[in-house]
Amino acid sequence: MTPAPPFLQATALACERDWRVLFENLDLHLCAGDMLQVSGPNGSGKTSLLRLLCGLMQPTAGQVLLNGQVLGRQRAPGCDLLWLGHAPALKDLLTPLENLAWLCALHQPAGADAIGHALNAVGLAGFEDVPCHTLSAGQQRRVALARLHLPGPSLWILDEPFTALDQQGIAQLENHLADHCEQGGMVVITTHHTLSRLPAGYRSIDLAKGSA
């Protein structure tokens, strides 16, 4: 049987910022069940690589394929990719329920009950209707991460998702990411945190070395 092609594939990828080459000739791919951790020192291009894989930036050279299609600057509505950046990216005046309802509408709408269950999963039961600007940094991070507990894309691209989490939140997120991969999902992640649970499809790439 011919193996399925990678869901996400980057070929001969290069990135340049402020006239400086961050990386070049970079190849990577993800199939169902894979987790790819991107590492490297500050300034090596970790966030830039993730933004390239999301179509939020264009590479200096090379291309990114998502489900066999070249990923351009404008992703198609509802494409099978979920991006969570370093900042929670919440609307301060909206509640967690309202923020998540708006975010889910980009992929697969979710009702109040489903959103309530997602907030409960990240330890925010009872905070559904509190304006997000009143929440702590850790609570805002958990609101954003609640998106991972709602129906949606199978590919998650996450930039430093453990930021501002306590030890319980870190352990819960580690398990959720591993479970997602073991159920056929995919994760690309940057983190300074040492992961204690790795799925079978775990790999890492060090941008300082340019190797996977």
Curated annotation (Swiss-Prot):
Enzyme Commission no = 7.6.2.5
The protein's enzyme class: translocase
Q: Which UniProt keywords apply?
A: ATP-binding, Cell inner membrane, Cell membrane, Cytochrome c-type biogenesis, Membrane, Nucleotide-binding, Translocase, Transport
- State where ATP binds: G40, P41, N42, G43, S44, G45, K46, T47
What's in the GO CC field? plasma membrane
A GO molecular function term, named singly, is: ATP binding
Query: Which Pfam family, just one, is annotated for this protein?
Result: ABC_tran
Which coarse location class describes where this protein primarily resides? membrane
Q: Where in the cell is it found?
A: Cell inner membrane
The record's Gene Ontology biological-process terms are:
cytochrome complex assembly
| Reactions catalysed according to its record | heme b(in) + ATP + H2O = heme b(out) + ADP + phosphate + H(+)
The ABC transporter domain, residue ranges:
8-212
Q: Which InterPro entries match?
A: AAA+_ATPase (IPR003593), ABC_transporter-like_ATP-bd (IPR003439), ABC_transptr_haem_export_CcmA (IPR005895), P-loop_NTPase (IPR027417)
Q: How does it sit in the membrane?
A: Peripheral membrane protein
Q: Which domain of life is it from?
A: Bacteria
Family annotation (PANTHER family): ABC TRANSPORTER I FAMILY MEMBER 1
The task this protein performs is described as: Part of the ABC transporter complex CcmAB involved in the biogenesis of c-type cytochromes; once thought to export heme, this seems not to be the case, but its exact role is uncertain. Responsible for energy coupling to the transport system.
| Family as reported in the entry's similarity comment | Belongs to the ABC transporter superfamily. CcmA exporter (TC 3.A.1.107) family.
The entry describes its oligomerization and partners as: The complex is composed of two ATP-binding proteins (CcmA) and two transmembrane proteins (CcmB).
What is the name listed in the Swiss-Prot or TrEMBL entry for this protein? Cytochrome c biogenesis ATP-binding export protein CcmA
User: Which lineage do the record's taxonomy fields give for this organism?
Assistant: Bacteria, Pseudomonadati, Pseudomonadota, Gammaproteobacteria, Pseudomonadales
